[in-house]
């Protein structure tokens, strides 16, 4: 068992690049599908138009995709120099952010051509613009996916183990649920993941356990099991499942079930369908927002939980008041209302909540104490 000792979260990985990525190349190693590629996109959002951006898929690279030889004359002699691929951004004036995705799967010849970029920000006689960042990702060698680097290649980088995001549902001293920071749940609530998928993870948190920690969950990829076992829930496949669930009205139940089983495995696909069927019990959303004081409230507490989850995901400045008015009614479970308030205040939607009088008044009234 390897374990996740001395590892960082995805957020921690991004911070390492921000602080030292212009001087050193970080090689982020982690299980397949945990979101390593998302490190690049979070950095892109952070730096905006200050940099040029290039993500290179090493699984499809050939030597010619990195550099091509050309003959030039120097001091009366013809010599060979290497011209870099324009996708690497050597020709641009602004600093570049380059990520070599799946570096461990690059062909050896191609990998050798990448090494000067990793260590010296150089390809041939060409140097990246000052202030450029280079990073790379690879899967754990223990995954058995042919991700291996030789010693002379490995030492060109700072290898950092990135841990798999945990499900992220905690329970406080009063027995109340809350969303833990730096978790998959926190990400899901901020990134429009289907409520049914969020509920699935809440009810089956083992789907985001790791074989590196010795988990024997039948829902996750584990290289020690038979290859025929179709268990592969991970952050990436959960996003795929979310996209499938969002079009449930356009496909048959048979098509939906088959697609979900193909995305996350048979066991998890069938269990997710239970949440999908529960989602059909949600009240009409348009009516709820138009008539929050009279729209029907589901009696089933788990349907209320899913409703609360959908409210967190979909809350906007023009709907927050109606959602607060709906959930403060007597028939709505206080526990789910509390989770809604806490989740909004710890999410990207915090700003609209701070400026909403209904939200603030209810928070003070229930002793959740959020103030402007």
Residue positions per predicted region:
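C-terminal regulatory/interaction module of P-loop NTP-utilizing enzymes
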Residues: 1-98, 103-372
